[in-house]
């Protein structure tokens, strides 16, 4: 049996205010009362879903990266979420996978949200990221990537857990609540989606709806509307049994 303990933080965000967001997150994370293997924050957790990278983008040695390392070291776990990064004259919506020792991996959002003009301000990534944690193979992606099942296809059982960080608006929450279980069932993997709550600077409301779905489509965790810092465990045996009983992959 291989258990993975995950802490998801469905949080309010302060619009385009890096310092205030990091200060708030630091305070709220102190509510974690048990050990955890992984802390998951939403997409652009330090700014909100902003199309203002010229003002907000940081380098890979910036304050938000340093903050992630501080939290990973403090809680002795991986910390992940996406931030705005500038690199070689391009801006990226970049997910950071930060370990306690300061080593990290990253994933640049592949599918940019054209309806929100994200493609006009950011450069798309080209490669998937697969990471390992406590014997689990994990594939982290960002928000709009959820709508592209071919990109997420678990062709060679490359992952046991698909992880989605998001700023997904309430007006399309039905899609979020439908697609996450679909990705879990078709890929015979756990799927964890972590969204924000509240209004952003464009008055777009986010209802959260963070969730964990097992490979059979069973709901392990679901939280609409309110801010929530929640820790739960998932069992890799569920993945093994699902794939053995229904060898579809």
Task: For each feature predicted by the language model, list its residue ranges.
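Short polar catalytic/cofactor-binding loops
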Residues: 10-15
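Extreme N-terminal starter segment of soluble prokaryotic enzymes
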Residues: 2-8
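Cys-nucleophile CN-hydrolase/nitrilase-fold catalytic domain and related Cys-dependent amidase chemistry
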Residues: 18-19, 23-100, 105, 169-182, ...
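Short beta-strand scaffold segments in enzyme catalytic cores
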Residues: 81-83, 94-98, 129, 193, ...
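Active-site catalytic loop in hydrolytic enzyme cores
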Residues: 86-157, 171-178, 241-249
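Structural motif
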Residues: 37-38, 138, 161
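CN hydrolase (nitrilase-like) catalytic-core segments centered on the catalytic cysteine
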Residues: 63-77, 147-229
């Amino acid at each position: 049996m291989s258990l993975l303990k995950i802490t998801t933080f469905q949080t309010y965000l302060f619009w385009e205010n890096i310092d205030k967001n990091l200060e708030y997150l630091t305070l709220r994370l102190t509510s974690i009362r048990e050990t955890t293997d992984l802390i998951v924050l939403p997409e652009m957790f330090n700014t909100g879903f902003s199309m203002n990278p010229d003002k907000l983008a940081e380098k890979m040695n910036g304050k938000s990266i340093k903050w992630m390392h501080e939290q990973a070291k403090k809680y002795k776990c991986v910390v992940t979420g996406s931030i705005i990064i500038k690199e070689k004259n391009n801006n990226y919506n970049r997910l950071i996978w930060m370990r306690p020792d300061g080593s990290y991996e990253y994933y640049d959002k592949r599918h940019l949200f054209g309806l929100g003009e994200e493609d006009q301000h950011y450069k798309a990534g080209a490669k998937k990221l697969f990471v390992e944690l406590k014997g689990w193979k994990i594939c982290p992606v960002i928000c709009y990537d959820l709508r592209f099942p071919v990109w997420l296809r678990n062709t060679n059982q490359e992952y046991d857990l698909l992880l989605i960080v998001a700023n997904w608006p309430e007006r399309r929450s039905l899609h979020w609540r439908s697609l996450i279980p679909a990705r879990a069932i078709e890929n015979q993997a756990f799927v964890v989606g972590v969204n924000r709550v509240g209004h952003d600077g464009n008055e777009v409301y986010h209802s959260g709806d963070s969730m964990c779905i097992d490979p059979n489509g069973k709901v392990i965790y679901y939280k609409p509307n309110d801010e929530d810092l929640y820790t739960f465990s998932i069992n890799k045996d569920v993945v093994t049994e699902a794939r053995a009983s229904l060898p579809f992959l």
